[in-house]
């Protein structure tokens, strides 16, 4: 059993939506200007993704359902432009996508608050019939080229090194690296970066 895993609730209210949007902005290090909202492509994508999550989770009216479809198309269009295939309701608040480039996430994944993710990352379901996907805790760093797959759990405060291939569960507060991945340090990203965490 993997310890130190606590997943954030998904967006269930307008207050949740505003909180997620603000935490994402802070994680990206962006000033809250109209220019940035319109011209910062990654933030633009994340705003659309969070609005889609809100509508999918709360929308019961015909208008909300139609608006959710429009938002889904917008997220898909922006994702194609940036190289992202990121479904709704996967990431907790404080998501920071480092750069435009290929990122593919299975819709069954659950990833906690304060995730920093780089390009050429694939997080998938593996070869099992159930197709269960990884569960990744809070305050995690996913380096460029990392591959994470299967019915596994990674604990809070885990760093995954560049090009690592992770196919089994690990407790938190570690750094993983290699093919297949193994623990290469007993320090996680919070210990290395001293980054303040989002309150859950």
Predicted regions and their residues:
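Short alpha-helix boundary/capping motifs
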Residues: 79, 107, 119, 143, ...
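Short linear elements at protein peripheries
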Residues: 65-108, 114
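Left-handed beta-helix
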Residues: 93-94, 98-107, 112-113, 117-119, ...
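Conserved beta-strand-loop-alpha-helix hinge in the C-terminal portion
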Residues: 174, 179-194
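Generic structural "secondary-structure junction" signal
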Residues: 40, 88, 93, 125, ...
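Broad hydrophobic/π-residue packing in well-ordered secondary structure
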Residues: 39, 49-56, 114, 118-119, ...
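Terminal amphipathic alpha-helical/low-complexity segments used for targeting or macromolecular assembly
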Residues: 1-82, 190-200
């Amino acid at each position: 059993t993997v310890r130190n895993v606590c997943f954030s609730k998904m967006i269930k209210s307008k207050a949740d939506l505003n909180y997620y949007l603000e935490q994402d902005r802070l994680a990206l290090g962006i000033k809250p200007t109209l220019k940035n909202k319109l011209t910062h492509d990654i933030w633009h994508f994340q705003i659309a993704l969070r609005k889609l999550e809100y509508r999918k989770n709360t929308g019961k009216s015909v208008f909300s359902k139609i608006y959710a479809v429009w938002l889904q198309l917008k997220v898909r269009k922006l994702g194609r432009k940036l190289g992202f295939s990121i479904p709704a309701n996967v990431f907790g608040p404080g998501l920071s996508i480092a750069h435009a480039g290929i990122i593919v996430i299975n819709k069954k994944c659950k990833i906690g608050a304060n995730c920093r993710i780089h390009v050429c990352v694939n997080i998938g379901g593996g070869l099992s019939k159930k197709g269960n996907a990884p569960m990744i805790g809070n305050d995690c760093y996913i380096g460029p080229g990392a591959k994470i797959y299967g019915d596994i759990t990674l604990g809070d405060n885990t760093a995954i090194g560049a090009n690592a291939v992770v196919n089994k569960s690990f407790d938190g507060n570690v750094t993983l690296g290699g093919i297949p991945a193994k623990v290469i340090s007993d320090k996680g990203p919070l210990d290395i970066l001293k980054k303040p965490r989002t309150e859950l």
